[in-house]
């Protein structure tokens, strides 16, 4: 639990994933890479990069336990990495590190158990060069929920998709280089007009102006030096 001032309290419960992955030299054991509550706060989605599954737990506030209710079984050797929900709570977006795709799911939590319906699968790659080891790593959405962005290491690019708010489906706008190595994460500024990308191997943060009309990302200024960055988030500070 957490305290009102944001401090972490004691651990209330814990779960342990078991099983073997399908990529022996890489992902061969459970490896949870993202945990995301559903927008209705009924369930917790644990994205397991190692065993190609998203385990869905019911949050039992009476017993303070997590109860496994369903498993989304992804393609073997796909490497699910990160998951985000639309603000209206109707759609989920999931990126895959190994097969370099993004998927759209419709979510419905109104029944006895959660329902995830796969709607769309799109590539995150600008090219399909078999000699490049690519890994889609970062996922974010614009503040107005109209655009989805993801970053891919290897070819070192960012993909921008326009999101249909009614259907949840994505339309690719561009996939462009980010002038850095291994873009592990990214975030849109609160103004919705700029994008920051953290580049793990080049020890940098690169920033871009987002030109939605012309479907472009325009680099702004020199990269900022940061030692092996992994993640980035914008948070409003108290005045």
Located regions from the model:
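Asp-box/WD-like beta-propeller blade repeats and closely related beta-sheet repeat scaffolds
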Residues: 1-34
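Short loop/turn segments immediately following beta-strands, especially the blade-tip
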Residues: 1-9, 58-65, 105-116, 161-168, ...
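Surface loop/turn motifs at the tips and blade-to-blade linkers of beta-strand repeat domains
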Residues: 16, 25-29, 72-76, 123, ...
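Beta-rich catalytic cores
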Residues: 31, 79, 135, 154, ...
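Residue-level detector of Asp-centered blade-edge/turn motifs that repeat once per structural unit
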Residues: 39-40, 87-89, 143-144, 190-192, ...
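Short loop/turn segments immediately following the C-termini of beta-strands
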Residues: 49-50, 59, 97-98, 107, ...
């Amino acid at each position: 639990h957490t305290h009102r001032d944001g401090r972490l309290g004691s651990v209330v419960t814990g779960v342990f994933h078991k099983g073997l992955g399908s990529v022996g030299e890489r992902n061969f054991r459970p490896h949870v890479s993202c945990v995301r509550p559903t927008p209705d706060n009924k369930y917790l989605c644990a994205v397991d990069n190692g065993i190609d599954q998203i385990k869905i737990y019911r949050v039992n506030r009476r017993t303070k336990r997590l109860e496994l209710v369903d498993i989304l079984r992804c393609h073997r050797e796909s490497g699910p990495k990160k998951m985000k929900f639309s603000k209206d709570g109707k759609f989920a977006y999931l990126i895959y590190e190994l097969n370099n795709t993004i998927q759209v799911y419709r979510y419905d939590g109104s029944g006895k158990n959660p329902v995830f319906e796969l709607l769309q699968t799109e590539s995150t790659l600008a090219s399909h060069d078999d000699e490049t080891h690519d890994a889609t790593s970062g996922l974010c959405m614009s503040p107005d929920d109209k655009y989805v962005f993801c970053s891919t290491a290897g070819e070192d690019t960012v993909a921008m998709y326009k999101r249909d708010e009614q259907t949840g489906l994505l339309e690719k706008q561009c996939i462009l280089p980010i002038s850095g190595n291994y873009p592990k994460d990214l975030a849109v500024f609160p103004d919705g007009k700029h994008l920051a990308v953290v580049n793990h191997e080049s020890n940098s943060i690169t920033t871009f102006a987002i030109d939605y009309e012309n479907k472009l990302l325009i680099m702004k200024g020199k990269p900022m030096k940061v030692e092996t960055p992994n993640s980035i988030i914008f948070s409003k500070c108290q005045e």
